[in-house]
């Protein structure tokens, strides 16, 4: 079946209602003091696009911290991570306004996304100032070019491919493009 992308609640309430995917994300938002932003209560930014960090990415970051030689940077829970670092991570994933998949330009098929001749896609600038390219890419179906599914993909000049999961989740104050569980926190 087809599920509806629309949710009759703000972004925070949407994520609070899906603890499997977003429990640690919600904890990070609250710890960073950014709850108002994700609830649509910031006057200058009532609508946002969140390139959604799944809980598994945060969990991996916490586990990976145990490999650090610097014991002051070993975390066992979200609240152990410095608030400023949580804030930095989150703002690297938030864009002002609502950017839907249909608002993103297609990739020029003649070039790979990172090649100099690439003139497709849409450059995204996040609140932390980092930039990446979002692009749509069609697929073939039954041998017919571009007759299949259209995917939203992202590529970072610093980190390469940004794994996507589910685009266009639409709570009342913006849109969430959920990143894949394999996403490494901060690699955007």
Which ranges hold each PLM region?
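Mature, structured domains of secreted/extracytosolic soluble proteins
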Residues: 1-188
């Amino acid at each position: 079946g087809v599920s509806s992308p629309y949710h009759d609640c703000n972004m925070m309430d949407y994520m609070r209602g899906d603890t499997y995917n977003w429990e640690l994300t919600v904890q990070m938002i609250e710890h960073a003091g950014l709850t108002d932003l994700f609830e649509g209560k910031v006057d200058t930014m009532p609508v946002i696009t969140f390139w959604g960090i799944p809980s598994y990415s945060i969990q991996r970051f916490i586990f990976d911290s145990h490999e650090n030689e610097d014991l002051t940077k070993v975390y066992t829970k979200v609240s152990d991570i410095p608030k400023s670092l949580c804030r930095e991570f989150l703002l690297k994933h938030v864009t002002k306004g609502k950017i839907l998949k249909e608002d993103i330009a297609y990739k020029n098929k003649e070039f790979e996304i990172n090649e100099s001749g690439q003139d497709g896609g849409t450059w995204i600038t996040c609140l932390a100032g980092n930039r990446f390219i979002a692009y749509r890419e069609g697929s073939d179906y039954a041998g017919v070019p571009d007759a299949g599914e259209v995917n939203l993909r992202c590529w970072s000049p610093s980190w390469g491919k940004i794994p996507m999961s589910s685009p266009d989740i639409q709570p009342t104050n913006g849109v969430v493009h959920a990143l894949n569980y394999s996403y490494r926190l901060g690699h955007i």
